[in-house]
Each structure stands twice: as C-alpha cells, then as structure tokens.
C-alpha cells in the first residue's frame, strides 16, 4: 500500500475510535442519569416516601374473597410510619414488624411495635366508621386526635388493651396499646399515655387519607 494511503487509513481509524469513545462515554453518562432518575422515582413516585424492606411490604389487596364494595386501604402502617414518629411515640423503630394482615371481605393492614412501657399494634382498615361506632357503642367515648374524629375504646373482652380508633376516608385506623411488664411495674393505668402515642403517630396517616 502507498505510504500516504496507509497514513490516511490510520488517521481515519483513529478518528472513528474517537467517535466510538465519545459515543460510549455519552451512553454511560445517560445510563447513570437514568439509573439515578429511576432511584429517585422509587423514592418519590408515590405520594410520600415509604419503607422498601421486603419483610415489611403489605400483601396483595385483592383476592377471591375481597369484597369490591369496600374502599381500598391506602395507609399501610408498616411502610408509611417513619422511624422518627415511632421514636417520638416512645416506641422502638427496630421492633417494627408486620402483624396479622387480613385481606378478605374487609381489609386490615397491621404493624406491631414494642416500647419500654407499652407495646402497640396499628391496624389500618376499610370497615366503615359507622360500623365501628355501633360495635363499641357501650365501651367507648368520642374524642379528637389532631383534629381528626376518634374513639377511645376500652373493650371489656380485652382488659389489658387500650384502643384509640381514628377515622379515615377508607374506614379507620385502630391503635391498640398494652402495658409491658415494666409499664405495669411503673404503675401505668390502662390508658395512661396512649393518647400521646396516637397523637405522635396520627400525622403519618396523611391528610389525603
């Protein structure tokens, strides 16, 4: 091959390599940007940040037993309540765990927390508020929590539990608190401090619910 032609080929190959390198660099940058955007969507794609740990995720909300006439439960206590709110309520965020979820003719999504003086179960359901009022008409009294309609329940069938039910658009959220051994030793009465716990956690439900 003529030396001049050889130099021309080498120069062309070098230029092509530079174009490929630039193209590859651009693709990598775009891929990284896309991955970053995907990560952001996973954090902000819902109406609010939620916990993503697999063991905390709720079950599917539809099955052959689900009654279509009831509204869908949006607030999931195990993935919506922040660690900061749990700590503010005097509970240990590290004890967060799913309780006994119910998805049938009605739905209740459940999360349990432990504390030094009290343990707490939070159940978010789509049973109508009116049904709840009727069920506990003889063992409850009305109250408000952060301006939200609520019910203080002292069920005679559960003497160790103090319940506060908070109305939502889907139905209500049931906060059920029980004293630990240390709480009983400290002289806590059945409902001592429970309203304060619920007051700290209620904002996590969200005004949209």
For the regions a protein language model found, what residue spans apply to each?
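Short, solvent-exposed recognition patches
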Residues: 88-151
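Sequence contexts marking disulfide-bonded cysteines in secreted/extracellular proteins
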Residues: 23, 77-79, 110-112, 161-163, ...
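C-terminal motif of bacterial Sec signal peptides marking the signal peptidase cleavage site
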Residues: 18-21
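N-terminal "mature-domain start" segment
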Residues: 23-102
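A short, solvent-exposed beta-edge/loop patch
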Residues: 141-209
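Extracellular/mature segments of secreted proteins
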Residues: 84-89, 118-122, 170-171, 198-201
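Bacterial N-terminal signal peptides that target proteins for export
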Residues: 1-10
